[in-house]
């Protein structure tokens, strides 16, 4: 008997390595876990594919979906809207697939109100200096944008205590191992195993 998938909320300030950790994690047994593809009104970055990285839509389309109550969470970040489809999340979890939401603390708060079993993971950088170095190293943003992201990072990180797990991404491989351990542990909880191993447990306890 297969068990329902777990919903993981993964948050971090921009530049902490959250997206890299999630994408690397998904390369291992991608059939049992996937990242939720959010809707957004921002323009695609180089290399991003519509429907794979995000569903890129207009502001008008996004507001129409809000009116339809189609999102489990949505937020405005740096002047752009981001949202996560309710229906897609539920259908995926019912298939026994773990789902990862790459969202900020505001979105996490909304999701937790609707799905109390969601598991929060916050990724922290080892220092502000390292975070700024990573943002600068991308070569994508102006100094003004980087300064704005650094200010936003402090605000984002102040909400770390709202999450069940904290990972410091000082060493990428260690951070990846920590994230993998969290996911594995949730598959081994009593509630999950009671469902997944029901037939075996019934047989073991039979007279």
Curated annotation (Swiss-Prot):
InterPro entries, A to Z: GK/Ca_channel_bsu, Guanylate_kin-like_dom, Guanylate_kinase, Guanylate_kinase_CS, P-loop_NTPase
Gene3D superfamilies: Guanylate Kinase phosphate binding domain (3.30.63.10), P-loop containing nucleotide triphosphate hydrolases (3.40.50.300)
Entry EC number(s): 2.7.4.8
Residues bound to ATP: 12-19
Keyword annotations: ATP-binding, Cytoplasm, Kinase, Nucleotide-binding, Transferase
Places the protein is found: Cytoplasm
Region Disordered, residue ranges: 30-49
Protein name from the UniProt record: Guanylate kinase
Species this chain originates from: Shewanella frigidimarina (strain NCIMB 400)
């Amino acid at each position: 008997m297969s068990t329902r998938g777990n919903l993981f909320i993964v948050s971090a300030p921009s530049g902490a390595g959250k997206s890299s950790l999630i994408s690397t994690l998904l390369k291992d047994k991608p059939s049992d876990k996937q990242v939720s593809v959010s809707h957004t009104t921002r323009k695609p970055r180089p290399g991003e594919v519509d429907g794979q990285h995000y569903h890129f839509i207009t502001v008008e389309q996004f507001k129409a979906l809000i009116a339809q109550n189609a999102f489990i969470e949505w937020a405005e970040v740096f002047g752009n809207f981001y949202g996560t489809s309710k229906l897609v999340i539920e259908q995926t979890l019912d298939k026994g697939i773990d789902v990862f939401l790459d969202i900020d603390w505001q979105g996490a708060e909304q999701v937790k109100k609707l799905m109390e079993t969601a598991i929060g993971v916050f990724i922290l950088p080892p220092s502000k200096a390292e975070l700024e170095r990573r943002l600068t190293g991308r070569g994508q943003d102006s100094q003004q944008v980087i300064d704005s992201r650094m200010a936003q990072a402090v605000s984002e990180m102040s909400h770390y205590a709202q999450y069940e797990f904290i990972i410091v991404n000082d060493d990428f491989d260690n951070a990846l191992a920590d994230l993998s351990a969290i996911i594995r542990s949730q598959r081994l909880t009593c509630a999950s195993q009671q469902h997944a191993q029901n037939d075996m447990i019934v047989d073991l306890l039979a007279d």
